[in-house]
Structure formats: C-alpha cells, structure tokens
Amino acid sequence: MGCLLFLLLWALLQAWGSAEVPQRLFPLRCLQISSFANSSWTRTDGLAWLGELQTHSWSNDSDTVRSLKPWSQGTFSDQQWETLQHIFRVYRSSFTRDVKEFAKMLRLSYPLELQVSAGCEVHPGNASNNFFHVAFQGKDILSFQGTSWEPTQEAPLWVNLAIQVLNQDKWTRETVQWLLNGTCPQFVSGLLESGKSELKKQVKPKAWLSRGPSPGPGRLLLVCHVSGFYPKPVWVKWMRGEQEQQGTQPGDILPNADETWYLRATLDVVAGEAAGLSCRVKHSSLEGQDIVLYWGGSYTSMGLIALAVLACLLFLLIVGFTSRFKRQTSYQGVL
C-alpha cells in the first residue's frame, strides 16, 4: 500500500508540474521603413508590436498613429497620447531632412533604404531595457547606447562621420534618452495593464498529418501540421516511442489571419520505417496534455493517458483500503 500511495502522489505531482507556464515578457518593438528614391521622393511607414500582437501602424500618408487594438493607448491620457504623436511627427520630418543632408554630405547614391528598430521591455519589479538600431540598405550601421550613437563593427567608414554630427545634437540625444528610458517603459506598463486579458489568452493548437512530395524512390516525407495556437512558442517533434527523431525539420512559424500561428514539421524516412512514428506537440495552452498523432491515423493525448493512469491508481487504492477494512472487520468478529 505504501508503494501505491507513493505512485499516486508522484503521478499527481507530475500532472501539476507539467501544467506550469513560464512567465512571458512582452517587448514593445517599433519598426520604421524609410525609402528615398531620390532627393525629392520619400516614404516612411511604421508598425509596432507588443510581444506577438501588432498594436499600431503609421502610414506615410497620415499624420496620426493608428491604434489597432481597443487598448492601444494603454493608460495614457488623450493629452499624453497627442503629445507623443506630435513628437513622432516632428521626428519623421527631421529624419527625412537629415537623411537628405547626409546623402548630400557623404555623396551617397540613391535609391536609399533605411530601417529603424526601437523599443523597450519591462521586467518584473519595473526594471527595463531598451534598444534603438538603424540599418542602411538592409545592414545594421549604428545604434543608440546609453547617451550617444555608436557604429556597429560592420558599418562602413562614412558612418563614423555621420555619428560625429549626430552626437553633437544634444537636444536629440536627450530626447531619445527620455523616450527610451522613461516614456517607453511607462507606455508599455500601461499597455500590459489595459491589454492583459488578450495578452494572456491561450489558444489550443489543432494538429494533423499528411504526406509531402516524395523525396526519392522508396522514401516518404511525413508532414505534421500544427495550426491555430497562441502564444507563439511551441514544440513539435517526430518521435519513435520516447525517442526524438533528429531528422525532424521544423519550418518557420507563420502567422494566421486571426493572430494565431501555424507550423509544420517534416521527416524524411524510408517507406518501410514509417510505422511506429508519431508527431508530438507541446504548447502552454495544453497544460501538459501533449498532442500525439501516430502515422497511420490514430490520435491520443498524453493528458488523457495521465488521467487514465491516475484513475487506475485511485481505483487500486480504493480496492486496497476496502480489502484491508474487510480483513480488519473479519479479525474483530473472530476475536
């Protein structure tokens, strides 16, 4: 009986432990794409994400940042939000002017493409970190570090001259510091509070198997599709029993139109060795009840297996106690 109790306790601990979901962080990432066809034609568009959710967009044809979620303003007042948008309008105008001046000064050839990635991440305890990176023609050239601009190791030589000019602009450097160190963490904290119900949502994946194009004579390409899950982190592997198949090739995690995600994982095998293979899916929404699909059509859930084991153990425990109680009653009758 002691062994049976131990097994029951161990199984319960395993079930509870597997349901734990690690704490997620939600960085705010703002992406700016600026195109300069020549000195007179330019276009700048922007997007922003909080974690995996797109929250804002900014079209070149508009002076207003578009909110894509009901909670995209966070806890900012209307006045704070308008002030922030005014700063962005001034920034966009200044950025366009400065790039044209640098192109002339450094004799850069049009067309020019620049990308800016900036934002911050708030950690428990109100600690935060931030970033501001600039790329030219698709390659990182500089970033804002602490109180000044610094070149990347791969930056062309002319970037050093541009940085000398940028670092002389004290007002701009102080504004960037204020936005990254103060405004951004405050804004993100408000977004996390206002959008917490959507940010913490869990959507269970759906999974199915199919056969891909034949990789060669006598071989099969097994495909495991996983779709409709949120949040993005997911674990998908082809298995033989409990042994992971090292040949598993996961694809990119792609977005669905409903803000969930899709992934497929393939395995190239000899046709005669496909029997006994399965695809296992782990995701936080499943709470430890992994999806397992067997090649050939059968389906099971590791959670259901665990529940079945617990039910059997509980049944045996009840039977054991009942039997022991009857024996004790019988002994008392004899005495």
Curated annotation (Swiss-Prot):
GO molecular function terms attached to this record: beta-2-microglobulin binding; cell adhesion molecule binding; endogenous lipid antigen binding; exogenous lipid antigen binding; lipid antigen binding; lipopeptide binding
Signal peptide: 1-19
Compartments reported by the entry: Cell membrane; Basolateral cell membrane; Endosome membrane; Lysosome membrane
SMART domains linked to this entry: IGc1
Residues at which a D-galactosylceramide binds: D98, D169, K170, W171, T172
Motif Internalization signal boundaries: 331-334
Protein keywords: Cell membrane, Disulfide bond, Endoplasmic reticulum, Endosome, Glycoprotein, Immunity, Immunoglobulin domain, Innate immunity, Lysosome, Membrane, Signal, Transmembrane, Transmembrane helix
Transmembrane residue ranges: 302-322
Domain Ig-like span(s) in chain numbering: 185-292
Residues of this chain annotated as glycosylated in UniProt: N38, N60, N126, N181
GO biological process, one term: innate immune response
Protein name: Antigen-presenting glycoprotein CD1d
Organism, scientific name: Homo sapiens
Gene name as annotated: CD1D
